[in-house]
Amino acid sequence: MTSILSSSEQAESLISELTIISAALMVLWLYLPGFLANTFAMMWGKWLPKTGYGPWPIDGGRNWKDGNRILGDGKTWNGLIGGSITSGIMMVLIVLQMGEPTALSETKATIFIHPLTGYEGSWWDTGSQISSAFILGTILGFSCLLGDSAGSFVKRRRGLKREGDVSSKAPLLDTLPFAIMVFAFGILFLG
């Protein structure tokens, strides 16, 4: 008799068979477009103004109650929109490169699990792999940039704003908020 496992039971079965290293690599693969959103945002934030568009700071140049800028010049609409969309495009490229998604039970041979495995019926499923991948990548990219903006907000409240091209002296606030947001949104999408 064949037992039908729910997608969460299949995921638990798969995860229990992974080593720490292969599990970490699988997570990085699934979240890659989200993690690279900061790089894409920086490129859009620097390159688009060279064409005469922007930069448009998200905070509009306004200050918070403490007298410091809310987010600063480094957080722009150019970067937020461009970084999010580029993450969506990257997820589409990953999905196109991988082909059709397989059942979770068939992924034991590789750490490179298809990002859309088990996506059918999800609230963000459009019926098309391409548009579903774009939505997933865009949301993961946006979540990364939202977390990065939250980190920037906290750094500015603590007086750790960046000076020119030099980052602040708060490496955890430069990386942790965006990683937490990507994982939180990933759990929302990937279960």
Please report, for each region that a protein language model flagged, where it lies by residue.
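Hydrophobic alpha-helical transmembrane segments
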Residues: 1-191
